[in-house]
Amino acid sequence: MKFSKLDGMKVVSLDAFRVGEISGIEIDTKRWDVTHIHIELTDEAIKELSFKKPIFGNINICLPIGYVKAIGDFVTLSRKLDGLKRIPECK
């Protein structure tokens, strides 16, 4: 699958909460494996995950690729929303 098809794709948690959209990926260049996806959070997800909404811009989290359950018309995660509370913000 081309990254261009994933870029901007909606991301939904296992409990059907709209988490956000894919905004990037991280690749281990030694093994040529995708290790993380970057998700730009929705305003609702920012609130539910207890992040502080910035005045400008958005919050992106770096989600380990193992959290992805399926990819179709949208990305389905293998965790409920509350299972994402310890995922760090991408810097």
Locations of the language-model features?
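Peripheral interaction segments used for macromolecular assembly
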Residues: 1-91
